[in-house]
């Protein structure tokens, strides 16, 4: 949080020296456990401290075979999961006290302006904050909707879905469940507290009773329309269990829970299912019966298997298993923008490929229209494109609040991101099933070329593209932005206008690239193929289905091929990887 420019980064599993060591000695371990501390554990697994002290090192001695090292790390720690298609579109997020009507009106204006969004992020003001009695503490943690802002939250969530938007809510879970919460009585009874005492239910991830009640509370809100959760953990790394990082276990448990089979208590049994279990009298009221049949019957399974997704902070090596990652509150400065490309690409060295940054910057800093336009451009070519800002009236990211030139650039960036969904979804498959992150440092493909290490702002974006974002203000005299780019040996083409660049020598070619505010340096390789979808109109501007037609950009100079990945949007279809 509040980083303004470069900060130190942890080590990955590669190095220029050819070896790296990952120390896992202090980590807890996941064990099969149906009983914890004498209490039933419905999860069937638990995170436990090691039963004896030991040194647990992993040595990666791959020379400069960087890709192979990271792919083997995935084999050791688990793969990067496949993301749902909507997560690759544009996200709208702002720390702001929207009312229910204001938020929906904003989403409607985006559609009228032809600006596609697929995900709505509602920051912490969805729940009670300012009207919490001080005797309970602050309103930073909350699980009860603010009825003044959202008088009918179920209708609000339903209206978002009707507009083609998924919804995520921001939560700060550290303060537990207190007596003013809607779910307090039920949660208190589950953990053995008399609700009449108004004793706070402590946030305790080492207590199976609390964990079960905690997730049931979330399930109720998911049944009302919440699609996934933004776990905004900021309260340190201490739990009752030695060595157990609460952020890590939160990510682990939330991600597993997000992919559970929904039960009849959360969603009605499939009325169209013709299996024997669903046809039995009383089946729609039997929780256990529905769970049993949903595990073996295709028609029910397809309906009830949720697509796992969470949105949280990085908790160390292995966090790639719990996408998407929130990189923290950023300061609105050129220094912050300059650091993000390097930060994103370098994270791939520990296998962490799905970062979500505060695109445009969150707070403080200064207002600079060129900064915002360049940040939008980087967002288009980032793993996740989530616009975000504080509640300051000067920090809003709506394109119509900027000059015409910058507004057009912003809108173009957001439209291009949505058009790139076929390409992005294919790279999503590549990340999940081939162990190749969407964003890669330049030295992965050219490990023995010194030039590849001299362009920290530059990165490969999937199999076909190379991106060298502009991260400094326009030159006053030229009124253009510039960056120093490096093109590996071969032919390259400007992604936007097709201009050809030849990099003849083995060391590649360094060049200063100048672009107007509506363009950024993006290069396609010779023989590159990039599939784009056409933007819909009106209510279909943010359509997420497989496109009926494609615009395919083909760049000459070499043979090429591209295998487009599509599925029907179900977990069962995506899990096959075919």
Region spans (language model):
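Catalytic-domain carbohydrate-binding cleft regions of carbohydrate-active enzymes
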Residues: 1-520, 524-525, 568-570, 576
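Accessory, solvent-exposed terminal regions and/or long lumenal/extracellular loops of proteins
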Residues: 522-578
């Amino acid at each position: 949080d509040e980083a303004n420019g470069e900060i130190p980064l942890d080590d990955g599993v590669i190095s220029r020296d050819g070896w790296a060591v990952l120390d896992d000695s202090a980590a807890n371990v996941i064990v099969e456990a149906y009983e914890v501390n004498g209490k039933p554990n419905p999860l069937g697994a638990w995170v436990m401290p090691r039963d004896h002290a030991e040194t647990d090192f992993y040595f990666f001695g791959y020379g400069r075979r960087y890709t192979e090292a990271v792919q083997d790390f995935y084999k050791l720690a688990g793969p990067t999961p496949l993301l749902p298609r909507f997560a690759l579109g544009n996200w709208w997020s702002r720390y702001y006290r929207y009312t229910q009507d204001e938020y929906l009106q904003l989403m409607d204006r985006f559609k009228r302006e032809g600006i596609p969004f697929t995900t709505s992020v509602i920051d912490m003001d969805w729940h009670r904050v300012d009207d919490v009695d001080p005797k309970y503490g602050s309103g930073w943690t909350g699980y009860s909707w603010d009825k003044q802002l959202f008088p009918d939250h179920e209708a609000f969530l339903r209206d978002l879905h009707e507009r083609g938007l998924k919804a995520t809510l921001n939560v700060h879970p550290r303060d537990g469940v207190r007596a003013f919460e809607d779910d307090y009585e039920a949660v208190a009874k589950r953990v053995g507290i008399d609700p009449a005492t108004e004793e706070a239910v402590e946030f305790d991830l080492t207590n199976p009773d609390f964990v079960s009640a905690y997730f049931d509370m979330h399930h109720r809100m998911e049944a009302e329309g919440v699609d996934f959760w933004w776990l905004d953990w900021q309260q340190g790394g201490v739990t009752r269990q030695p060595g157990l990082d609460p952020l890590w276990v939160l990510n682990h448990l939330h991600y597993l829970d997000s992919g559970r089979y929904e039960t009849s208590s959360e969603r009605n049994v499939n009325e169209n299912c013709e299996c024997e279990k669903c046809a039995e009298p009383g089946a729609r009221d039997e929780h256990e019966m529905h769970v049993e049949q949903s595990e073996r019957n295709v028609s029910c399974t397809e309906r009830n298997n949720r697509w796992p997704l969470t949105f949280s902070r990085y908790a160390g090596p292995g966090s790639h298993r719990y996408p998407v990652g929130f990189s923290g509150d950023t300061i609105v400065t050129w220094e912050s923008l300059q650091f993000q490309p390097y930060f994103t690409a370098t994270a791939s060295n520990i296998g962490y490929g799905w970062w979500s940054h505060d695109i445009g910057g969150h707070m403080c800093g200064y207002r600079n229209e060129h900064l915002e336009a360049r940040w939008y451009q980087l967002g288009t070519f980032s793993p996740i494109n989530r616009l975000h800002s504080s509640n300051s009236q000067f920090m809003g990211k709506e394109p119509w609040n900027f000059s015409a030139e910058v507004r057009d650039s912003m809108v173009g960036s957001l439209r291009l991101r949505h058009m790139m969904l076929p390409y992005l979804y294919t790279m999503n498959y590549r990340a999940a099933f081939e162990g190749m992150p969407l964003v890669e440092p330049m030295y992965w493909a050219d490990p023995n070329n010194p030039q590849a290490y001299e362009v920290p702002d530059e990165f490969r974006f999937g199999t076909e593209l190379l991106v060298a974002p502009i991260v400094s203000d326009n030159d006053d005299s030229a009124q253009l932005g510039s960056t120093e780019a490096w093109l590996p040996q071969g032919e390259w083409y400007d992604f936007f206008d097709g201009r050809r660049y030849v990099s003849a020598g083995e060391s590649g070619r360094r060049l200063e690239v100048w672009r107007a505010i509506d363009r950024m340096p993006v290069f396609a390789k010779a023989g590159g193929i990039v599939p784009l979808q056409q933007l819909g109109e009106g209510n279909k501007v943010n359509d997420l289905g497989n496109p009926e037609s494609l615009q395919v950009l083909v760049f000459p100079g070499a043979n090429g091929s591209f295998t487009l990945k599509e599925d029907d949007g179900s977990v069962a279809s995506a899990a096959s990887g075919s």
